[in-house]
Structure formats: structure tokens, C-alpha cells
Amino acid sequence: MNIKNVVVIGSGTMGSGIAAQLCNANVSVTLLDLKTEISEKAKKKILESKPPLLIDKSKIDNIKAGNIEDNFGTVEKADWVVEREVERINIKHNLYQKILKVRKKESIISSNTSTIPLKVLSEKMSHEDKKDFCITHFFNPVRYMALLEIVSEDINDVKKINFLKIFCEDSLGKGVIICKDTPGLLGNRVGVYA
């Protein structure tokens, strides 16, 4: 398995930050939102961000902007699809069904949420699809915050989760912890009491 092509759905602060960190690692990224103009605006914000999200401004060429209607076919070629949509479960469930219909079988699907439990996110998925689905909770700003929480279930393909962990450590420079499926995960819970 290898991660060379990633689709990030949702180009807000977190989605664009994840896309930027992936392109810093020379990964080809497609950044999708409701309209291509929104994704293009996110690319512009990445270039203008302070502190900079890119290690070199030329890295922005690794990101293609698009929309979830016209460019959804990019999901078919993605090694990893990262969902960063609004925290509304019905929207997420509908999006996952669309992703799961077209994605290549060996791909990883993840959500960047820390507020909705993995069991709730995956409740409408088949047994097979649940094996490839997890939470990858990045912190903002993605380039500078070292922590990444990965939440998986017993049903997950352990080899894929371990591969994703190593990829995020080695290629994205993250300190990865595997968390239980609890509200707020670990980082947010510790932060509340710090």
C-alpha cells in the first residue's frame, strides 16, 4: 500500500490545513468543496497564511481544487479520502455513502472529527467498509501541531491502521496516538483539564 493521491472533502481551516501538510509531503491532493470557487479561495488562503502552511510556496501546485459534484470522480483514484465537512451526522452519512460507492477497495477513508463517535459515523456502513474507515483528528494549525489522534474499532484492518500511523509519522511529521472512541478523544479531554 502507498499514499500518493488524497482527496480532502471540505476546504475550511482544517481541510485546507490537512491538504497543505499532505502537499508538503509531495502527495497529490484534490481539495473538494461545494463549489470550485470555495476550494480555489482555500488554496489562496494557504499561500497567504501566517505562519506559513507550506514549506515552499511551489508546493501549492500539488493541490487541485474542485467541487463535490463535477470532480467527485477523483475519489475513485484516491489512496486516502479525508472528510472534513460540517459536524452534522446526516451530511456525513450521505457523503460516506457517495464515497463508498466509488472508492477503490484498498483505500482508507477517514473523518477529522473529534465530536462525533466513530461508531456513529460508521453505523450505516457495511462490515467490509468499516474495516477501512477511521478518525484522523488533526489539530490546528496542522503544520505546527504535532499531535494526530487516530481512532479505530476492533473491526478495522490493523495493517491499514498501522500503515496510516507510520505514514503520518514519517511523511507528515506527526506524533500519532491511537485513541479509544470516546467523546473529545484524548487531546481535547486533556486540554479541558489542563
Q: Predicted regions: what is each one?
A:
Residues 1-49, 102:
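NAD(P)+-binding Rossmann beta1-loop-alpha1 motif at the extreme N-terminus of oxidoreductases
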Residues 9, 17, 66, 84, ...:
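Structural motif
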Residues 20-24, 58-80, 163-173, 178-184:
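Amphipathic alpha-helical segments at domain termini/boundaries
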Residues 29, 63, 81, 109-110, ...:
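Hydrophobic/aromatic residues located in beta-strands of well-ordered beta-sheets
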Residues 31-57, 150-159, 176, 182-188:
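Rossmann-like dinucleotide-binding cores of NAD(P)H-dependent redox enzymes
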Residues 34-41, 52-109, 115-120, 148:
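Rossmann-like NAD(P)-binding element
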Residues 106-111, 122-139, 174-175:
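Rossmann-fold dehydrogenase core element
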Residues 127-129, 147-182, 191-194:
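Internal alpha-helical scaffold of NAD(P)-dependent oxidoreductase catalytic cores
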